[in-house]
């Protein structure tokens, strides 16, 4: 256990129930942000979960960090009178092994269980570590913003790109900005009735070139449900403004929606 977690309140939890211990751990995560953990404010996580209203099924967070999406979902389901471990299956990918261990500890402290992959095999750009394309009822995530130097050929080979690659640097053959890789992944993981909620850099709402093309294709599906603008300086370690985006799919109706769209613009 990280030393500064133990000194931030956990040592005072003797006699407290597991929920109190979990709350102490959540509070500690705000303190250890400088140790490499990218903490997502609980209010943003809670909003995503409240909008998606998970009840049962498979939940994937392909950039799971310390596991906040799982914990909040567990709380939501349990408060609805169900047992989250009985009705939900949690899957996570987290490349940084320290963060994945913190995630496992976090969900365990909250009485939850999940399948968390870490290390290079959990690099979502290049691997679908749990083989969940098209199988998820829910996808929730706060991925890293504006990542560059992602190998385009490896991304292409890994699939999960229903709208194609975003912009690629012709000289280096690297993806210039990975925001729309993440957005494509979230969409591709959903099953026919899936719902996705995620945090994204606000620049993704009006980025140009291939990003604009992908955004147009996504909007054309009719599955973009809600976009909420989040003000600057909302995160503890980030000053960039961001947005919360919600997708709700019924992919069986995609052909019908496309036909209706084409008729409107004809």
Regions found by a protein language model. Name each.
Residues 3-6, 26-27, 37, 81, ...:
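A generic structural signal for ordered alpha-helices
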Residues 133-266:
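A conserved structural/catalytic subdomain of Rossmann-like adenosyl-cofactor enzymes
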Residues 35-141, 146-148, 153-157, 200-203, ...:
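Conserved S-adenosyl-L-methionine
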Residues 7, 13, 20, 34, ...:
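Intrinsically disordered, low-complexity segments enriched in small/polar residues
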Residues 1-43, 47-50, 115-118, 123-126, ...:
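Non-catalytic, mostly N-terminal accessory regions of nucleic-acid modification and defense proteins
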Residues 22-25, 49, 104, 187, ...:
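Residue-level recognition of well-ordered secondary-structure positions
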Residues 4-16, 54-71, 218-251:
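Unusually extended, aromatic-enriched hydrophobic runs near protein termini
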